[in-house]
Curated annotation (Swiss-Prot):
The gene is ppc. GO terms for cellular component: cytosol. The lineage of its organism: Bacteria, Pseudomonadati, Pseudomonadota, Gammaproteobacteria, Alteromonadales. Its EC number is 4.1.1.31. This is Phosphoenolpyruvate carboxylase. Forms oxaloacetate, a four-carbon dicarboxylic acid source for the tricarboxylic acid cycle. Keywords: Carbon dioxide fixation, Lyase, Magnesium.
Length: 878
C-alpha cells in the first residue's frame, strides 16, 4: 500500500518536514520533539496500543496554556498540507491508476458509440447539455482566503518540482520558495477575526473563477473538442457551453438578515465588474496576437479597408471594456460615473458580435489555426460566463412572501391572507395575476421586513434577465407559495419571466411535491408563464435532518420520479435542481456517482447542482482539478441521459420503502422522541462553541430560542463531525439494514447493491461515513463533557453505530470498511494520527471553557484552531 502511494507520501513527508523546521526555528527543539512524540503515540494508539494512548493523553492534558495555540496550529497546518498533497496527487504526473481514473468523457464516448446510439444523437445531446453549477457560500468554510491562496502556491511548486528538466539550482529555488510559503502559513492567523460579510463571500466565489475556472473552461472545451473530433471527425460549435455557473452568494437571503437588496445590487455590480476586467485582460493580449492583415469582405467593409482591421476592432472593444470597468468601479465606490453610457458594454452581443466577425474573417481567410487560439477561448468564455460572470439566484423563505401579501391585504381591509385556506389564496392570487390594476398602493408604508422583500423584487425588475438565475422559494409546500412570488414580481414591474422555483425540503414536502406541481400545471395562466419549462429544487440537507439519510434519500428519489411523470403528462420540460451539501448528511458525495444514481429520465440533459464552500475549493480550486471536475459532470449527465440506469424492480422498491420506514422511525426515536437527546447533543459536541466562530455571514439558527428543528443543517452536521460520531450521516440507516438482514433479505440487499446505482451509492456513502466515525473518540468527549446521567444515551448511539457497520460489512461481503476503495481508505488513514490529538485536546479545552467563568484568550483561540483542524482532517465540515 505504501508503495502504491509513494509519491503522495513523499510529498506529505516533504511538507511535514518543512513545517517541522519552521516550528523548530520559531519555538525550539523541545517543543518540536513533543509534537513528534504525540504524533508517534497517536500512530501507536491507532494500532491498539493502550499504553501509547494513555501516554499521549497524559502529554496532551499537561500542555501549559502558552503551548496550546502552537500545538493546535502545528497539527492543523499539517492536516492542511496533507490535503494539499492529496489534492495535487490527483493531477500529478505520478498519480497512480487507482486514483487517476481514465478520462470519463473519453470512456463514455467509446461506450456510447459502441452501443446502438447513433453519432448524431450523441452530438446533439452533447451540444445541448445544460449543466448549471450553483456556487454557494458555506458557513463552515473554515480556511481564510489568504491561506487558500498560499496553499494554491504550494501546489504550483509541487507541480514545478515534478519537471525532470529542472536544474539543481532551479530545484533549490523552488525548495526555498516552499520553505518561505510554509513559514508565511505558520505565521498567519488561521482564524478570522470577524465573520465574512455576504459581499466577502461573493468576492471569494469570484476569486475561484478568476484563479481557476476562467482558464479551466476553455482548456476543458478544447480537450472535449479533441475527443469528439477524434471519435467522430466533427468539431464542436464555437458557442458550446455544456457547463455554466450561477451563484447564491449575495442572493440567498433565507435566514440571513445581512443579505439586503443593497447588498444584492453590489454583488451584481461586482460580478459584472470582474467579468469586464477579465475580458479586458484577454483583449489586451489578443490585440498583440492579431497583427494579421488579410481579412474577408465583411471585416474590410466594417473597418473601411483598414491596414490592421483586426486590431482596429479590438482597440474599440478594449476602450469599451475600459469604460465599463471605470463605470462599475465608480458605482462600487459610491460615485456617479462620469462616463458616456453609450460607450460601455451593456449586452453580451456588444462583446460577442465583433469577436465573431473576426473569427469568421480569420476562418474565411485560411487562418483557422489562429482563429482557434485565444479568440476561440474568449468566445467560449462569453458562452459560459456572459458579461455578468455568474447568474445570481435569489432565495427567500415562503413565509416571508406570505407575510408581504398578508400585511397588504390587512392594509387594504381585505382580511388576513395568512388566515385564508389554500383555495382562497389561489383564487385571490390568480385574480390579481390576471388583472390589470396594481395591487400595491403608492402610499403604503410596509414594515421593515416586508419592505425588504418588496425592495428585492423591485431590484430584480431593474436587472437584465441574464444577470439573474432563479428565484428559489425555500420551505415551499403548496401552489400558493409559487403564485405569491409571481404576484410580487408582477407588482414590482419585473419585465421578464424569471424562473420561480419551489424548494421542497422536508419529508412531507418531498412526498407532496408532485401533487403541488400537478395543481400548478393545471392552471392555464401558470402554464403560459412557464412557456413549457419548469425548475424544481430538491432539498437534501433539511430532509436528512428531518428524517435521517436513508428515508430522505428514498423520498428524494421517489419525488423526482413523480415530478418527471407529472411534467411528462403536462408536456413540460423539467429541470431538477439538487441542493446538495459537501457532507453525506447533506446529500454530498462524489458528483459523478450521485448523478448516475438519479431515477431514469430525471436528468435528460439538464441539471442544476449546488457546489458549496470547501467543496468548491476541492473540486475547482485549480485549473487542472476544475477540468477534471467539469469532465466528470459532463460525462455523468451525458451518461444519465443516453444510457440511463434500469428501472428498479418492484421487489427493490418494496424493500427500499420498508428500509425508509424503519430508518425514519429509528432516527426519530432518538432525535425527536428521546427526551435527553438535545441535552446530550449540546454537551457532547462543540455546537454551542461553534456559534462563536466567525465562519459564515449567516446565523447558525433560524430562531434563537429553538431546539434541533431550528438549527440549520450545516452546524448540526458540523458539530457531530467534530466529536467524530458523524451521527446525522448514519443514524437510522444501519438499524434498517440490520432489520432487513434479520428478516432474511440480505441476498436481496446484495442484489440491489450490485445492480441498482441508487442503492449502491447510498451504501458506498454510508461505508465512507462509518470509516470516518470514531466511537472511542466520541466516548472520550462523553467522559469529559457529558453529565453521567446522560451516558446511557451515548452507549445506545455507539451500539447503533456498531450494528450499522456490521450490517454494511455483511452486505458488501467485506472484512473491512472501504476495502474496495483503497484510495479513500488511504486518505482517511493518512490523516488519523494528526486528527486524533486535536480531538483529545478539543475535548479537554471544551471542558475547561465550560467550567471557567471566562476562558483565557489562549484557550479560546486554541479551541477554535482545533475545530478548524478537525474540519480540515475530516475533509468535510457541514
Amino acid at each position: 500500500m505504501a508503495d502504491m502511494y509513494a509519491s503522495l507520501r513523499s510529498n506529505v513527508g516533504t511538507l511535514g518536514q518543512i513545517l517541522g523546521e519552521t516550528i523548530r526555528t520559531n519555538l525550539d527543539d523541545a517543543f518540536l520533539e513533543k509534537i513528534e512524540q504525540i504524533r508517534q503515540l497517536a500512530k501507536s494508539s491507532r494500532q491498539g496500543d493502550e499504553a501509547a494512548r494513555d501516554e499521549m493523553l497524559k502529554l496532551l492534558t499537561a500542555l501549559p496554556d502558552n503551548e496550546l495555540v502552537p500545538f493546535a496550529k502545528a497539527f492543523n497546518q499539517f492536516l492542511n498540507l496533507a490535503n494539499i498533497a492529496e489534492q495535487f496527487h490527483t493531477i500529478s504526473r505520478n498519480c497512480d491508476e487507482l486514483v487517476c481514473v481514465p478520462d470519463p468523457v473519453e470512456q463514455l464516448l467509446g461506450r456510447v458509440l459502441s452501443s446502438n446510439i447513433d453519432q448524431e444523437k450523441m452530438l446533439d445531446c452533447l451540444e445541448n447539455l445544460d449543466i448549471d453549477l450553483v456556487l454557494t457560500a458555506h458557513p463552515t468554510e473554515i480556511s481564510r482566503r489568504t491561506l487558500i491562496q498560499k496553499y494554491a502556491s504550494v501546489i504550483d511548486i509541487l507541480a514545478a518540482l515534478e519537471n525532470p528538466q529542472l536544474t539543481e539550482r532551479e530545484k533549490k529555488q523552488q525548495h526555498l520558495r516552499l520553505r518561505q510559503l510554509i513559514a508565511q502559513i505558520w505565521h498567519t492567523n488561521e482564524i478570522r477575526n470577524e465573520r465574512p460579510t455576504p459581499v466577502d463571500e461573493a468576492r471569494w466565489g469570484l476569486s475561484t473563477i478568476e484563479v481557476s475556472l476562467w482558464q479551466a473552461i476553455p482548456d476543458f472545451l478544447r480537450q472535449l473538442n479533441e475527443q469528439v473530433e477524434e471519435r467522430t471527425g466533427k468539431q464542436l460549435p464555437t458557442d458550446i457551453a455544456p457547463v455554466r455557473f450561477s451563484s447564491w452568494m449575495g442572493g440567498d437571503r433565507d435566514g440571513n438578515p445581512f443579505v439586503t437588496a443593497k447588498v444584492t445590487q453590489e454583488v451584481l455590480d461586482r460580478n459584472r465588474h470582474t467579468a469586464a476586467r477579465l475580458y479586458l485582460k484577454d483583449i489586451v493580449v489578443l490585440v498583440n496576437d492579431l497583427s494579421v492583415e488579410e481579412a474577408n469582405a465583411e471585416l474590410l467593409e466594417y473597418t473601411n479597408n483598414s491596414l490592421e482591421p483586426y486590431r482596429d476592432v479590438l482597440k474599440d472593444l478594449r476602450q469599451k471594456l475600459r469604460n465599463t470597468v471605470d463605470y462599475l468601479n465608480a458605482r462600487l465606490e459610491g460615485h456617479s460615473p462620469e462616463i458616456d453610457l453609450s460607450s460601455i458594454i451593456w449586452h453580451e452581443s456588444d462583446l460577442k458580435e465583433p469577436l465573431l466577425m473576426l473569427y469568421r474573417s480569420l476562418t474565411d481567410s485560411g487562418m483557422s489555426l489562429i482563429a482557434h487560439g485565444l479568440l476561440l477561448d474568449i468566445l467560449r468564455r462569453i458562452a459560459c460566463f456572459g458579461i455578468h460572470m455568474l447568474r445570481l439566484d435569489i432565495r427567500q423563505d415562503a413565509e416571508r412572501h406570505s407575510d408581504v401579501i398578508a400585511e397588504l391585504t390587512r392594509y387594504l381591509g381585505m382580511g388576513d391572507y395568512n388566515h385564508w385556506d389554500e383555495s382562497e389564496k389561489q383564487a385571490f392570487l390568480l385574480r390579481e395575476l390576471t388583472g390589470k390594476r396594481p395591487l400595491i398602493p403608492s402610499n403604503w408604508q410596509p414594515s421593515d421586513d416586508v419592505a425588504e422583500v418588496v425592495s428585492t423584487c423591485r431590484l430584480i425588475a431593474t436587472q437584465p434577465a441574464r444577470a439573474l438565475g432563479s428565484y428559489v422559494i425555500s420551505m415551499a409546500s403548496k401552489p400558493s407559495d409559487v403564485l405569491t412570488v409571481l404576484l410580487l414580481l408582477k407588482e414590482t414591474g419585473c419585465p421578464h419571466p424569471m424562473r420561480v422555483v419551489p424548494l421542497f425540503e422536508t419529508l412531507d414536502d418531498l412526498n407532496n411535491a408532485s401533487s403541488c406541481m400537478t395543481a400548478l400545471f393545471a392552471i392555464d395562466w401558470y402554464r403560459g408563464y412557464t412557456k413549457g419549462h419548469q425548475e424544481v429544487m430538491i432539498g437534501y440537507s433539511d430532509s436528512a435532518k428531518d428524517a435521517g439519510v436513508m428515508a430522505a434519500a428514498w423520498a428524494q428519489y421517489h419525488a423526482q420520479e413523480e415530478l418527471v411523470e407529472v411534467s411528462r403528462q403536462a408536456e413540460v420540460k423539467l429541470t431538477l435542481f439538487h441542493g446538495r451539501g459537501g457532507t453525506i448528511g447533506r446529500g454530498g458525495g462524489p458528483a459523478h456517482e450521485a448523478i448516475l444514481s438519479q431515477p431514469p429520465g430525471s436528468v435528460d440533459g439538464r441539471i442544476r447542482v449546488t457546489e458549496q464552500g470547501e467543496m468548491i475549493r476541492f473540486k475547482f480550486g485549480l485549473p487542472k482539478l476544475a477540468v477534471q471536475s467539469l469532465a466528470l459532470y459532463t460525462s455523468a449527465v451525458m451518461e444519465a441521459t443516453l444510457l440511463p440506469p434500469p428501472e428498479p424492480k418492484p421487489e427493490w422498491r418494496a424493500c427500499m420503502q420498508k428500509l425508509a420506514e424503519e430508518s425514519v422511525d429509528a432516527y426519530r426515536s432518538i432525535v425527536r422522541d428521546e427526551p435527553d437527546f438535545v441535552a446530550y447533543f449540546r454537551a457532547a459536541t462543540p455546537e454551542v462553541e461553534l456559534g462563536k466562530l466567525p465562519l459564515g455571514s449567516r446565523p447558525a439558527k433560524r430562531r434563537v430560542d429553538g431546539g434541533i428543528e431550528s438549527l440549520r443543517a450545516i452546524p448540526w452536521i458540523f458539530a457531530w463531525s467534530q466529536n467524530r460520531l458523524m451521527l446525522p450521516a448514519w443514524l437510522g440507516a444501519g438499524e434498517a439494514l440490520q432489520a432487513a438482514s434479520d428478516r432474511g433479505e440480505m441476498a436481496l440487499l446484495q442484489e440491489m447493491e450490485q445492480d441498482w446505482p441508487f442503492f449502491k451509492t447510498r451504501i458506498s456513502m454510508l461505508e465512507m461515513v462509518y470509516a470516518k466515525a470514531e466511537p472511542n473518540l466520541a466516548k472520550y468527549y462523553e467522559t469529559c463533557l457529558v453529565p453521567e446521567n446522560l451516558h446511557h444515551l451515548g452507549e445506545a448511539l455507539r451500539t447503533r453505530l456498531a450494528t450499522g457497520i456490521k450490517a454494511v460489512l455483511e452486505l458488501t461481503q467485506s472484512n473491512a470498511l472501504m476495502e474496495h476503495t483503497p484510495w479513500n481508505r488511504e486518505s482517511v488513514t493518512l490523516r488519523n494520527p494528526y486528527i486524533d490529538p486535536l480531538n483529545f485536546v478539543q475535548a479537554e479545552l471544551l471542558a475547561r471553557t465550560r467550567k471557567e467563568e471566562e476562558a483565557s484568550t489562549n484557550v479560546e483561540l486554541a479551541l477554535m484552531i482545533t475545530i478548524a483542524g478537525v474540519a480540515a482532517g475530516m475533509r468535510n465540515t457541514g
